[in-house]
Amino acid sequence: MVHKKRGGVTSWLFRKSPVHNVLPLLHSWESCHQATGCGVQLCHPTARTAPQPQCPGPLAQGAAPSPSTPGSVKVASPLECSICFSGYDNIFKTPKELSCSHVFCLECLARLAAAQPAGRSGREAVPCPFCRQPTTVPVAGAPALRTSRQLQAKLPAHLQREEPVWLEGTKLCCRPLPTTSGQEDGGFVSVDVGLSKPAEPTLPVPVQDPAPNPGWLARCWARFRDWRRVALVSVLLLVLFCVILWPVQCALKTGNLRCINRPPAATATATVTTDALSFGVLANN
């Protein structure tokens, strides 16, 4: 029956293949023709029970890969700054466009400009974080860079009106305009974009009582410091002469360390007795 339905193919299979392999090959060949949407395909089965051919259809144009796919890449939102990942607004996060058409928020570009050394003309050149192409910053600072109107138009309606922002030293300052006529002025808002940290508050130093005014003698004593040293050295030399050198010169002259010679005690007693007798004789006369 199969031979009558497709005689040419079955006769070729009977000639080229053994008898016990003919039926599985025919079954595989018929499965290829019955698949929907495949058209006529040439099937080459390699096993007895060949798998059923599958014909995946083409992907729809513009179809993005599923987020759960391992190879899928998460695309950043166009309304976020690529540096700080903060949403754009109309104050410090205003979308500013560089000369290379890359867009970043105002605060990040102001920090980049503050970190760059000053050029010859006194203006900084900010390199793009993506392509490294330099962009000259105007004299007024980063707030004077061109605003991306294309991204600004995609913001909500209340953020499409750009607020006036200016640079004072290392601070971005803004004075938000009142949204309604009856709203009061909210004052100034600022953010520091400099590299230096704010100074820590120091504790107050206790005030000490002034020292009493020294007298004239103390002032003279402090003024003639060199003369004090000369006097001290002179006194030390005199003491050295009296204590050491005087006994030495006495020993060299007299041969004895005692420079003062004391009289004998007997001679002194006889002298006293003679004097007493002389006074007694004079009294009797």
Curated annotation (Swiss-Prot):
Subcellular location: Membrane
Keywords linked to the UniProt accession: Membrane, Metal-binding, Transmembrane, Transmembrane helix, Zinc, Zinc-finger
InterPro entries xref list: RING_finger_E3_ubiq-ligases, Znf-RING_euk, Znf_RING, Znf_RING/FYVE/PHD, Znf_RING_CS
Recorded GO MF terms: zinc ion binding
Membrane topology: Single-pass membrane protein
GO cellular component: membrane
Zinc finger (RING-type): 81-132
Location, primary (coarse class): membrane
Species for this entry: Mus musculus
TM segment ranges: 230-250
Protein name as annotated: RING finger protein 223
Residues of the signal peptide: none
Top-level taxon in the UniProt lineage: Eukaryota
